[in-house]
Swiss-Prot record:
GO CC annotation, single: cytoplasm
EC number: 3.5.1.5
Keyword Cytoplasm: yes
GO molecular function, one term: nickel cation binding
One GO biological process term: urea catabolic process
Keyword ATP-binding among UniProt keywords: no
Membrane-spanning parts: none
Protein name: Urease subunit gamma
Enzyme class per UniProt: hydrolase
Native organism: Thermosynechococcus vestitus (strain NIES-2133 / IAM M-273 / BP-1)
Catalytic activities: urea + 2 H2O + H(+) = hydrogencarbonate + 2 NH4(+)
Cystine crosslinks: none
Family of the protein in this entry: Belongs to the urease gamma subunit family.
């Protein structure tokens, strides 16, 4: 299988998000990389489904709460930026203050 660098990045995000999803389901608090992967994967999937950039920017703030992550993670994670592929092309989605 030959993947472009962007496809490899998406695969890495998905794999990390899968680990984060499983840990969250078991009641474990997510660390910084897991939280970023969890939010990023949800944004990528939403773009694939055809949701708008504005919708995804808002959606990204609803995925995790302070109770879902380790202490200090909300303060470290001030924004998440994901280059997502939409039906009409690739766009940058920025989620400001994703953990509230």
């Amino acid at each position: 299988m030959q993947l472009s660098p962007q496809e490899k990045d998406k695969l890495l995000i998905f794999t990390a998000a899968l680990v984060a999803e499983r840990r969250k389901a078991r009641g474990l608090k997510l660390n910084y990389p897991e939280a970023v992967a969890y939010i990023s994967a949800a944004i990528l999937e939403g773009a694939r489904e055809g949701r708008t950039v504005a919708d995804l920017m808002n959606y990204g703030t609803t995925l995790l709460t302070r109770d879902d992550v380790m202490e200090g993670v909300p303060e470290m994670l001030t924004e998440v930026q994901v280059e997502a592929t939409f039906p009409d092309g690739t766009k940058l989605v920025t989620v400001h203050t994703p953990i509230r």
